[in-house]
């Protein structure tokens, strides 16, 4: 039994020993697992660069750097957005405009070439430099808010003179006419060999050209074709217009004085001519006995015409045959236009009496002097389908020289202030069925012309007179709804005498700071102005072609005065480039005035040589 007990005890001891080793084994396994996990965690942390407490200090810096990277990325994206906006909102429309204009010009050019081939001329159509595409015949300044007179002309700029001048002391160049289309410009003037009052014989200079930009960015007018019509015909009072076939011109042919013409019983001969792109000139006499059967005298308006709806429109004026249908239709009709804030003090009945008499001045034998507009179909045949429009005198004043203009989609008739009303007039013109309808005019109170008493620049009451001078305004500033706000022009700033030419921008009441041609005693006469834009630089320029007194070579010299239109609220007067301060070493101040009659020739010669030597 003791043996059995011992055997049981031994087995118990062995079982306890086994349990002990199992526990040790399990503990060892657990410890090794924990150690393995710790080592694995450490290795994993090391491999993933996990942050330690000391690393947390750099978190704000890291966040700041991340913020900078994000901001930089967003900035880059904004740059991309800005570039996209510029491309979509600015560059693409301009590119489309240029493309449209280029296609239009290409089609027009092709049409000209086809016409040229049909006429065996072999000559293509000229086109302005691309810098001017979209900048000719457009509303150049659209501004609802700014004061019109905050725009003003710069000093006169030097550019290529495209107008021939007299070459003798007795020569005379007068009556400039200018018109510019989207493709080319046309210019003409009269050339008289012996003084400016000769009515028996003269030449007519006619030129066709384009606008160019020099390598330095300067504007210049490049004459491509020109002709001097020196024949037995005495063309006078010519108006020119740029058309798709070249330069169309309307002239009267006269051999007598204006007063004698008004006293005659038959209309004045008229001719429709054209200088083609090939440099050839052709013309055709109009059937004035039918077209002007109610007229005793008829003349083009001197100012440029305009190409509208496949027809060329010219201003016309002259004398009506007494008691003819056209004269009877105007009987008793009149209009009175009033000065701004300067009412005529005469009794209303007397004003009406004088207004009616103003259409029949004594100078022309009491004939009714009438305004009119002549339109002619533009085709290879000259003088085709002429139609004469005679507007009612309930709208127009006494007939006078004028100009037909197109700016944007608007058409205007300028009428010279030959009657009592001094401020410049622009009648809105509506074209339909080959005829024109005029409406009450825009008036520009500060844009006056000199005149004889009682129709001087300050006149405010109706009177009968034939006076004034041709100084047309060019529509420059518009409202967004296309209503005209302001014009540019060169006026003669004197009450009675043709003196003191100045350029300015005008609203209905006042004018901007001015740019003088020279001194206030400078003699001048006709001026005609045209504005355009260099689209590439967005700069607006205006050209005033002016007759300036020139005592050395002829009585007048026709000068193309070029200005840039600027904008600010500066002083009221600017001098021409002749008087502007230039770089040190240049001495422009000795040439005073531009066209001077030097009294001391020796001293003048010395100063002139010094002046020439001072230029770099």
From Swiss-Prot:
Keyword Metal-binding set for record: no
The alphabetical list of record keywords is:
Disulfide bond, Glycoprotein, Hemagglutinin, Host cell membrane, Host membrane, Host-virus interaction, Hydrolase, Membrane, Signal-anchor, Transmembrane, Transmembrane helix, Viral attachment to host cell, Viral envelope protein, Virion, Virus entry into host cell
Q: What membrane topology does the annotation report for this chain?
A: Single-pass type II membrane protein
Provide one Gene Ontology cellular component: viral envelope
Q: Where is this region: Involved in neuraminidase activity?
A: 234-239
Among its keywords, does the record have Transmembrane? yes
* Source organism, top-level taxon: Viruses
What's its catalytic activity? Answer: Hydrolysis of alpha-(2->3)-, alpha-(2->6)-, alpha-(2->8)- glycosidic linkages of terminal sialic acid residues in oligosaccharides, glycoproteins, glycolipids, colominic acid and synthetic substrates
What does the entry give for GO biological process? symbiont entry into host cell; virion attachment to host cell
Q: Which residues are glycosylated?
A: 119, 341, 433, 481, 538, 600
Q: What class of enzyme is it?
A: hydrolase
Entry protein name:
Hemagglutinin-neuraminidase
Query: Gene that codes for this?
Result: HN
């Amino acid at each position: 039994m003791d043996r059995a007990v011992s055997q049981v005890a031994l087995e118990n001891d062995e079982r306890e020993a086994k349990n002990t080793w199992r526990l040790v084994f399990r503990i060892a396994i657990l410890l090794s697992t924990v150690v393995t996990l710790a080592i694995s965690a450490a290795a994993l942390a090391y491999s993933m660069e996990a942050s330690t407490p000391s690393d947390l200090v750099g978190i704000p810096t890291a966040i700041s750097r991340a913020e900078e990277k994000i901001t930089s990325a967003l900035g880059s994206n904004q740059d991309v957005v800005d570039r996209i906006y510029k491309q979509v909102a600015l560059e693409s429309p301009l590119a489309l405009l240029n493309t449209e204009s280029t296609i239009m010009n290409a089609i027009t050019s092709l049409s000209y070439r086809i016409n040229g081939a049909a006429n065996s001329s072999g000559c293509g159509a000229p086109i302005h430099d691309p810098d001017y595409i979209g900048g000719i015949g457009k509303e150049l300044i659209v501004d609802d808010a700014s004061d019109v007179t905050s725009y003003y002309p710069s000093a006169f700029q030097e550019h290529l003179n495209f107008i021939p001048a007299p070459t003798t002391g007795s020569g005379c160049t007068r009556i400039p006419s200018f018109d510019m289309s989207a493709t080319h410009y046309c210019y003409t003037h009269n050339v008289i060999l012996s003084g400016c009052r000769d009515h028996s014989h003269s030449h007519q200079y006619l030129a066709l050209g384009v606008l160019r930009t020099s390598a330095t960015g300067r504007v210049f007018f490049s004459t491509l074709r020109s002709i001097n019509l020196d024949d037995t015909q005495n063309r006078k009072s010519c108006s020119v217009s740029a058309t798709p076939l070249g330069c169309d011109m309307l002239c009267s042919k006269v051999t007598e004085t204006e007063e004698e013409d008004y006293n005659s019983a038959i209309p004045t001969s008229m001719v429709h001519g054209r200088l083609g792109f090939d440099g050839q000139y052709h013309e055709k006499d109009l059937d004035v006995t039918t077209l002007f059967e109610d007229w005793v005298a008829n003349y083009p308006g001197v100012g440029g015409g305009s190409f509208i709806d496949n027809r060329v429109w010219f201003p016309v004026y002259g004398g009506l045959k007494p008691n003819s249908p056209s004269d009877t239709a105007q009987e008793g009709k009149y209009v009175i236009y009033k000065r701004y804030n300067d009412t005529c003090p005469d009794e209303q009945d007397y004003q009406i009496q004088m207004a009616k008499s103003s259409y029949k001045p004594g100078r022309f034998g009491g004939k009714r002097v009438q305004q009119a507009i002549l339109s002619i179909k533009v085709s290879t045949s000259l003088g085709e389908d002429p139609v004469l429009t005679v507007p009612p005198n309930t709208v127009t004043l006494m007939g006078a020289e004028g100009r037909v203009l197109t700016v944007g989609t608007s058409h205007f008739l300028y009428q010279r202030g030959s009657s009592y009303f001094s401020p410049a007039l622009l009648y809105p013109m509506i074209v339909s069925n080959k005829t024109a309808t005029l409406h009450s005019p825009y008036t520009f109170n500060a844009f006056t012309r000199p005149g004889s008493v009682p129709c001087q620049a300050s006149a405010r009451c109706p009177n009968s007179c034939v006076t004034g001078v041709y100084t047309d305004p060019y529509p420059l500033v518009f409202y967004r709804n296309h209503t005209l706000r302001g014009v540019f022009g060169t006026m003669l700033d004197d009450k009675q005498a043709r003196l003191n030419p100045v350029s300015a921008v005008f609203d209905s009441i006042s004018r901007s700071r001015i740019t003088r041609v020279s001194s206030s005693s400078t003699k001048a006469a006709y001026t005609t102005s045209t504005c355009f834009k260099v689209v590439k630089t967005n700069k607006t320029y205006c050209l005033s072609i002016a007759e300036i007194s020139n005592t050395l070579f002829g009585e007048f010299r026709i000068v193309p005065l070029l200005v840039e239109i600027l904008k600010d609220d500066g002083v009221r007067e600017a001098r021409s480039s002749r008087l502007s301060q230039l770089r040190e070493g240049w001495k422009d101040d000795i040439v005073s005035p531009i066209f001077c009659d030097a009294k001391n020739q020796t001293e003048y010669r010395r100063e002139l040589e010094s002046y020439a030597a001072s230029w770099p």
